[in-house]
Structure formats: C-alpha cells, structure tokens
C-alpha cells in the first residue's frame, strides 16, 4: 500500500526533493535540487513513531560497519552540485553521500545505520562545507569565535597578536613566533595554518620559517615587496611546495604591475587584494586576473559595492596601515587606494569568475565574521543588476550559487594545498560541515560540525526543560572541550616541518597535516572561477575594461542578509 504525498507535504516531512526550489535567506537567489539520493517511500527519519528504530531503519550491524553519525535528508550545496542526500560521518570524516537505512530490509541503502549511529536531522536544512578564510591577520584570538559562528572552519594567515606589524600584515615572522602560534593553535576548535614573512632577498630567512611550520610565505608592501624579494620568495616556495601570498606595491615604488608580474616568472602565486580598494598596485592591480599563474582573491570590506563603501574605507585605511591623516603624503597614499570605478568592477569580476576567492582581511579593514554573508550579498546584487548567468535559467541560480560557494570553500583549499582534507563535501574529507535553515542561509548557521562532532550550535537556556527556550544564541559544544578539541580540528604545516618532527619538539596536541600541490595549481584549476580576461584600467578615469567590455555597476542602497537579521 502506498500513499501519494503532495510536494508541499513531502517537503514539510522530508525536506525538498528533485525539482523543488529554495530561496537563500532574503535574497533573490533560488537554488533547485538537481537530484535526490534518497528513495521515495524508504526515507529515514528519527523521532517518536518514525523510521530509525531497531529492526526498522536501524540495523543490527556492529559499530565497525555503520556510520558514527548520519545527517538525514539534507540538501547539499557544493561546487559539484545541489543534491538531496543522507550524509555519513565516520571517524571524523565524510564517509558517504547517499541513502541511509537498514540494508537488511531496505533497498538501495549505501549508508548503514546501527546502534552506534547518532542522527542529526537535516530535513529542511542546507549543508555546505566549512568556509576557508585565507586572509587572516591574527590580531586577536577572539576572531576565531566570530569566524566559527559564521560558518568558517579553517583560517589561514599570519600574525602574533595586536603588534603593529600584525595589524597591517598577515605574517608570523621567524621560527620563535611560528612555534608560539602553533602552540596557541592547540587551544582553538578550528583548523589553522600560518604564513611566514616572505620579504627577504636571500633564501635562509625564509626556509627556516617553512622548517618551523609555516604553510607558506606572505609578501607585503609594508615590508618591501620588491622584485628581488618576490623572486627569492617564489624560489623558496618552489623548493618547499608551499604557497606565496602577496600584497603588491600600492605606491609603485619598485615598479609597476608589469614589473611585479615579470618577477613572478610564470610561477604560481596567490594575489591578495586583487580588488578595487584594498591595496596593491594603484590603480591597475586588477590586471593580474588575466594571468594563468595568478590565483586572485579579494577581501570583504568592498563586498559588495554600496553607497557607504567609499566613506568607510578612508578611516579604516589610516588606522590599519599606521598612517597619519595630518601628513599629506600619508593621506595621498590612502586616497590612491580607494577608487569607486575599480570597486564597481570588482563586483562584476567576481560574478564572471575572474576573481576566484573571497576572504576577510580580519581586523585589518575586513570583518572576520562576514566572509560568507558578503559573498552571498555580492551574488544577490549581481543577479539583480545583471540578471541570470550563462548556465542558469528562469527557474534557478544553481550555477551562480556553485560559483560563489566555491570562492570560500574549494578554491582557497586548492590554492593553499589543503583540498585533500577540506573545502568540499566529498567522501574521505574531514567532516567540517555547516547546517543552515534556508531563511537564515549565509547569515546565521544552525550548527557547525568540526571533524564529525558538533562544535557550535544555537542553544537555548541551559537550565530550561528543553533546548529551545530563550535566550537562544551560539554556544560552544563538546567538540570544543578537553581532548576532543585536538581530535576534531587540524593544524596545517609544511611537509618540511612535519619531517623535522615539530609536533614532538613543540609539544603539540593537534594532528598536523602537510600542505601539498601548492606549486602546480593554476588559474585553470579555480573551480567555476577560472576566467582570464585581458584587463585594462584607465590611469586617468580608473575605468575597467575586460576583453573589450566596460565593467561598471551602480552601488547598492539596500542589501539582503542585513539589518532584519541583526535587530538583537
């Protein structure tokens, strides 16, 4: 005997299925479920009178043969697709994406549930991979709380605290500081990787930082990003399979953008601040988007272009780069970096996939908890102003959604050599997952899972009789306590450091994972974000032309995912 359910009734019970559409928060973005891995009539759901009970949806198999945790009936949004499925987690990793249940009595089961299995109800929820922020100034450890609660589960950057150097540059300089920061990483329930200072004209000062545990090196103009420093840094990176991130020369003191590109010599590099106002060669740093060896990212303070963007930036810049507004030269330096035309073009270059990544620039002009919000605000603004992307139709924005989610998940992972562990929802990867109610998508996660265990969740009064009474806010869960912390989060290091035995030497508790493949990744590998246009920026008007087309758009006066979500 079968019962035919209406689409509405089915969605309310088991979540959306193939062909159903979901609005992302209060944006104009709609995603459509492309495939449903669960079988109609054989869905599993936990609760009183539901399916996951002994002898029904729960099998008699031992712990070794069943999932540790199953997220049931979730909608997965990732660079590779938008699907409905059950997600299995085993030993802290994603074990399978498919159909959960009892293989003894149910057809099509690819994920076995047993007495050893915990259930997280994913009905009606969207699941994304944990975000990766690759532009972190480690100024204050409290940034980690903000980032984690926003859905970011991996942070890459540099610094030592609120030192003047760290306030301006993302560098953890030298072996002593590197050791201290790696020891500090043991205390935080998030994946971390640190960049050493790359500004040196001889190899030894750089190699010793890689040996100490740096996953890469950061070249910053405030330390002198000369062609000699660039060439030396990239040579060391090639020898150690680590990445180089660069903040180029705003003042064009050591050469123009062409001189910097020439110093790259075709070698892979992650260009920070490939944007309209964040820094780097003024006014034409955007030109590097067209280089095959350049992996470009921009930061969130200019995301998206709004009526308030320009006014906000001048004061931020003066503080972050230790400038004095009473000195004419300092003021001119700041004003040269803030250009409405290039900021507007940045929106469009993101939408067309020329800019491959988006990050925060935390407490150094960017907001660490707003990478995900501002990514989707940019996607919304571009849909409203530019319409559907090629590949999307009238029914959904699936391609645009895949393009934008890739900017803070898989592409940063590929760039920094950690995609074998994180960056997407795929079997074998570390189970860093973010669960969202669609109405709060991109703004306020319902739950953040780290290494297969719940790390942060919205939780009500701990003294209440049920979990939901007010005040409901983000609270750290058991994955952040005791020995579980070190077993549910990772610290990324170089292979050179791992071979040198820094784990034992520094007394580290977290698992150390080496980065790999940093030197072979190219712009072509940036998923859904690999466009290499020929860009020209007019030195007088700052107009941006890409492949012959003028890139311009109006600033937004109103944005979604904003004040209505943050009244309290």
UniProtKB/Swiss-Prot annotation:
Carboxylation allows a single lysine to coordinate two nickel ions. The modification N6-carboxylysine is found at residue 218. Substrate binds at residue 220. SUPFAM superfamilies: Composite domain of metallo-dependent hydrolases, Metallo-dependent hydrolases. Residues 130-568 form the Urease domain. Its EC number is 3.5.1.5. Ni(2+) 2 binds at residues 218, 247, 273. GO terms for cellular component: cytoplasm. PROSITE patterns: UREASE_1, UREASE_2, UREASE_3. It is found in: Cytoplasm. Its cofactor is Ni cation. It catalyses: urea + 2 H2O + H(+) = hydrogencarbonate + 2 NH4(+). The keyword Cytoplasm applies. Ni(2+) 1 binds at residues 135, 137, 218, 361. Pathway: Nitrogen metabolism; urea degradation; CO(2) and NH(3) from urea (urease route): step 1/1. Binds 2 nickel ions per subunit. The active site is at 321 (proton donor). The keyword Chloroplast does not apply. GO terms for biological process: urea catabolic process. GO terms for molecular function: nickel cation binding; urease activity. Keywords: Cytoplasm, Hydrolase, Metal-binding, Nickel. It comes from the Bacteria. Heterotrimer of UreA (gamma), UreB (beta) and UreC (alpha) subunits. Three heterotrimers associate to form the active enzyme. Belongs to the metallo-dependent hydrolases superfamily. Urease alpha subunit family. This is Urease subunit alpha. It comes from Burkholderia pseudomallei (strain K96243).
């Amino acid at each position: 005997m079968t019962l035919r359910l209406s689409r509405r009734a089915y969605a309310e019970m088991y979540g959306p299925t193939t062909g159903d559409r979901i609005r992302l928060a209060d944006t104009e973005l709609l995603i459509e479920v492309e495939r449903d891995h669960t079988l109609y009539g054989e869905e599993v759901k936990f609760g009183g009178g539901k399916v996951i009970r002994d002898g029904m949806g729960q099998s008699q198999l031992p712990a070794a043969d069943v999932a540790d945790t199953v997220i049931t009936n979730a909608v997965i949004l990732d660079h590779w697709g938008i699907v409905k499925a059950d997600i299995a987690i085993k030993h802290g990793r994603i074990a399978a994406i498919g159909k959960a249940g009892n293989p003894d009595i149910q057809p099509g089961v690819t994920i076995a549930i047993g007495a050893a299995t915990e259930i997280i109800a994913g009905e009606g929820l969207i699941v994304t991979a944990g975000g990766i922020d690759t532009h972190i100034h480690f100024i204050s450890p409290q940034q980690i709380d903000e980032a984690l609660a926003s859905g970011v589960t991996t942070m890459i950057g540099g610094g030592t605290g609120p030192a003047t150097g760290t306030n301006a540059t993302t560098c953890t300089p030298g072996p002593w500081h590197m050791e201290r920061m790696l020891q500090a990483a043991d205390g935080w329930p998030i994946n971390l990787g640190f960049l050493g200072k790359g500004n040196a004209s001889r190899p030894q000062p750089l190699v010793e930082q890689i040996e100490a545990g740096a996953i890469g090196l950061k070249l910053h103009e405030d330390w002198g990003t000369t062609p000699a420093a660039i060439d030396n840094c990239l040579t060391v990176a090639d020898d150690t399979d680590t990445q180089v991130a660069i903040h180029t020369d705003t003042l064009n003191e050591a050469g123009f953008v062409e001189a910097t590109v020439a110093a790259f010599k075709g070698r892979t590099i992650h260009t920070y601040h490939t944007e309209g106002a964040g820094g780097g060669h003024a006014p034409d740093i955007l030109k590097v988007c067209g280089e095959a060896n350049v992996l470009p990212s921009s930061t969130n303070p200019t995301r998206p272009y709004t009526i308030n963007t320009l006014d906000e930036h001048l004061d931020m810049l003066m503080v972050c780069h230790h400038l004095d507004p009473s000195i004419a030269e300092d003021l001119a330096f700041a004003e040269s970096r803030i250009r409405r035309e290039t900021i507007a073009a940045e929106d469009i270059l993101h939408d067309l996939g020329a800019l491959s990544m988006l990050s925060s620039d935390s407490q150094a002009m960017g907001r660490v908890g707003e990478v995900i919000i501002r990514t989707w605000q940019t996607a919304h603004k571009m849909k409203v102003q530019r319409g559907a992307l090629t590949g999307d139709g009238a029914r959904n924005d699936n391609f645009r959604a895949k393009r934008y989610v890739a900017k803070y998940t898989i592409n940063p992972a590929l760039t920094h050599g950690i995609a074998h562990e994180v960056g997407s929802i795929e079997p074998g990867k570390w189970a860093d997952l973010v669960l969202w109610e669609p109405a709060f998508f991109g703004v306020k996660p319902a739950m953040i899972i780290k290494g297969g265990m719940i790390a942060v969740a919205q939780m009500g009064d701990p003294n209440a009789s049920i979990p939901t009474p007010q005040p409901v806010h983000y609270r750290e869960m058991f994955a952040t306590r005791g020995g579980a912390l070190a077993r549910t989060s990772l610290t990324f290091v170089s292979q050179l450091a791992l071979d040198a035995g820094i784990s034992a030497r520094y007394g580290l508790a977290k698992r150390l994972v080496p980065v790999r493949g940093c030197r072979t990744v190219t712009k072509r590998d940036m998923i859904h974000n690999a466009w290499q246009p020929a860009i020209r920026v007019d030195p007088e008007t700052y107009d941006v032309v890409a492949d012959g087309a003028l890139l311009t758009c109006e600033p937004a006066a109103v944005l979604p995912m904003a004040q209505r979500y943050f009244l309290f």
